[in-house]
Amino acid sequence: CRCRPDWFNGTAVVDLKSCVDASSRGFSRAIANLGYDIQAAFYVDGMKAVTGTELPFLFVAVEKEAPHAVALYRADPEIIEVGRKKCRAALQLLKWCQDAGSWPAYQPGGEIELISLPRWAANTDAFEFDAA
């Protein structure tokens, strides 16, 4: 395991995150949307392997826009547990891909898929020109 916490003092793992919305509601969305739960679990487990103790994980959320509001959050146990489950699933998928020599993406069966322009881009009326 390799991790680089932004700050570690032996009592907590701290990660600094820039965000659009540092409110608890906004930042909890960022945690879910950006996979910060996976990172938190990985860091907590990695530091436990080194220290022998499961330490709290703290997020320092800093808004990108002035006045750059700041909030400090401690990840609740559910965040860590959900992150662990996602991490385990990702590692199982990685192992399967390596063992099978297959890296499925958008066409897992290898089929060729027909693709079309989006409806808005196929509007040819916008491109007609009357020179008369």
Language-model features and meaning:
Residues 1-3, 107-108:
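Metal-dependent nuclease catalytic cores that hydrolyze phosphodiester bonds in DNA/RNA
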Residues 32-37, 42-132:
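Metal-dependent nuclease catalytic regions and adjoining charged, substrate-binding loops involved
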Residues 3-29:
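Conserved catalytic cores of phosphodiester-cleaving nucleases, focusing on short active-site segments
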